[in-house]
From Swiss-Prot:
Similarity comment: Belongs to the OMP decarboxylase family. Type 1 subfamily.
Gene: pyrF
Superkingdom to which the source organism belongs: Bacteria
Active site as annotated: K65
NCBIfam families for the chain: PRK00230.1 (NF001273), pyrF (TIGR01740)
Protein's name in the database: Orotidine 5'-phosphate decarboxylase
Catalytic activity: orotidine 5'-phosphate + H(+) = UMP + CO2
Organism encoding this protein: Prochlorococcus marinus (strain MIT 9515)
GO cellular component: cytosol
UniProt enzyme class: lyase
Pfam family, one: OMPdecase
Amino acid sequence: MNKINLEDKIILAIDGLNIQEAKLFLERCPNIKWVKVGLELFTREGPNVIKFLKDLNKKIFLDLKFHDIPNTMEAACYEVSKLGVDIISVHASSGYKALTSSKNASLDGANLASVNPPNIVGITVLTSFSSEEFRNDLDRKNSIEENVVRLAKLCFDAGLDGCVCSPWEAKRLRSIYKNNFELITPGIRTKTQNKDDQNRIMTPYEALKNGASRLVIGRAISKAKDPNKVFLDICNSIY
């Protein structure tokens, strides 16, 4: 794998910034190709942030984690797909009907807007959950990994393009789905970084070795004094 391909595998989370701050930040990070827009940033700035990032020729992971009844998810995916984003996240636990409706609606919306259709990925179990919290807070009898495997299968059967999981589960999922199913992994931390509010974490090298397709990295880069250097250092540490 060459360094150019590695740059395409890292998605920078910029949720803590407004548009002007994001503009200044991305000017300092010319090597970054992918940007994640989450609920905080999209709620603050709305669709304008998508237009802004597209004008910078960035690829966009719109991580709004839609989770609602099928009709509402269908309508939401239809609308945001018209913005020309590259990946949209929905909660896998919304069920088969909601997932298939979301996928089909994204194709229709993109077609209407004459943009490329986005990949739809399903959120399995949030990386902020520890095993104890997952068992006690949600009253789940099965392990996190077993639930991730079950939800990933639901995504695959519903025709989604991939799922979001922690790097801990990526190895097992990759053994099941080989290379025709995208595995996006948050919970990425460098060896010197605090885990913050994440629990099931790995280094970038470990996550890719486990089968992750793309890595979502936020504070390790966004809080750095020289973010572009840190980004390239991460690429070099994997290469």
